[in-house]
UniProtKB/Swiss-Prot annotation:
Record's protein name: Apoptin
Pfam families, sorted: CAV_VP3
Induction (record text): VP1 and VP2 are detected 12 hours post infection, while VP3 only after 24 hours.
Domain of life: Viruses
Species lineage: Viruses, Viruses incertae sedis, Anelloviridae, Gyrovirus, Gyrovirus chickenanemia
Sequence ranges of Polar residues compositional bias: 58-70
Location(s) in or outside the cell: Host nucleus
A GO cellular-component term linked to this record: host cell nucleus
Keyword Ribosomal protein: no
Family, per entry: Belongs to the gyrovirus apoptin family.
Comp. bias intervals (Basic and acidic residues): 88-102
Region (Disordered): 1-28, 57-121
Amino acid sequence: MNALQEDTPPGPSTVFRPPTSSRPLETPHCREIRIGIAGITITLSLCGCANARAPTLRSATADNSESTGFKNVPDLRTDQPKPPSKKRSCDPSEYRVSELKESLTTTTPSRPRTARRCIRL
């Protein structure tokens, strides 16, 4: 009574369930798309579809599918350690040297000192 046909297009009260297969159909008009997300690869076989180009910043042809994305984005597929970050030294002698340099530059007098002459009458 509630049997669903797998080849019927979706209607107002019908659930459309397309046939699923683990192997792609062998036709000259099939396109295979591989999508990699967080270590998982999804392979889509699109058969009987028309070719349409929609260039975006992340689009690539099937031949160049490994070269998508920006150059500055790190490759998350490898587990390489991060390079050590530059840390400030906590050596007290270095702090004193920088403190002395600051005090020498900030305590310069506003006008040069001159010898005062006293005039006696």
